[in-house]
Amino acid sequence: MRTLQCEQIFKKKSNNFVTKSIKNYILGLFICIGKKNCNTIASVMGVSYYSVYRSFWDFECRKKDLQDYFINLVHIHATEENPGVFMVDSTQIKKLYSRKSDLLCYDRNGSMKSVLKGISCVVAAWTNGKIVIPLAFDFWVREKDITDDRKYRKKTEISRELIFELKDKIPFAYASLDGDYGNEEFLIFLYKYRLKFSIRMPSNRRIVIDGIDETLKKHPTLKLIRNERYKKAQGYYKGIPVIIIAHKRKGKNNTKQVVFIVSNIQGLSAKEHVEAYACRWPIEKMFRTAKQKFGLENCQCIPDEKHEAHISFVLLAFTEAELNKIANGQKSTEKSIRFIRDQILSKMNSGYDHWKGLFMCF
């Protein structure tokens, strides 16, 4: 952990990219009730619409500064004993009634369990088990929905680009990824750059263990007997050496479900492999909090760059809530958000200098 002097130096440098308009936007995300857009933020902050909308223009010149801020935070909270976990996952921002945006497409929405219209993005984040720090994101558009001259990229391609861009900039022990990344192409990429991983794999994938070629769900070596909850085996997927873990867990409606994890992390028991994979859940919680508390789905602008700015501001607000949670010993991000909102509302008439002790980026 850094010393107090390092904190002060870092904080002084981080102030450079936060303009007054960006500051208004972040504060508004915390105190707005209901939809969080430029109109409501300007109303609750008591400033003009233009002064809030200008934050989108300010962001264009400060995108790299924001990513550097996130990367510096990772270096502050990572230690040799716990270098952290790299996470990549996709989420959909619902836009059911929107019509004019090059980013609009139909995609499966995991929370609604159906295909909906919206904006899909792939997000990279880092966690050490105590704090979650978003790092970068990029948009995905379904091939048939592309209306401009952009080249189609699969979500796994975007994920590889994010990992490649960030792998040498931040410390992490391994990457924990969902079942969408349990394929030959992605595993080859991870092995190529000597990255450790823990990935859930669909049960219909064929693997080879002890010379037996069979699907994961039917392989005799991975069969769990009676009350057995974990089983580990060394095998191959498409010729790629992997450690394969079968894990029986509780499913919906009090049922039992067997999931499969592949990894190349040596020296762990089957249970420890399951715990290593579980480190990817913080990114799911981040998506939920960003949508429910910070209005991730509330941007009503049409241009792509405005959506990018809004998402970035939401991720910045989430990060500040995470930092406040650590600093004040809060038990959850939601409690941290309520604490910050109360502090802002109590100081609304005191001037902007009073926000300096509340946010790391101000």
Annotate the PLM regions.
Residues 1-10, 14-18, 22-27, 32, ...:
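Single, function-defining residue in the core of a domain
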Residues 39:
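Residues within the helices of the helix-turn-helix
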Residues 43-55:
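Short, basic interhelical loop/turn and adjoining N-cap
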Residues 53-59, 305:
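Short linear loop/turn motifs
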Residues 57-131:
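Active-site-proximal, Lys/Arg-enriched surface segment
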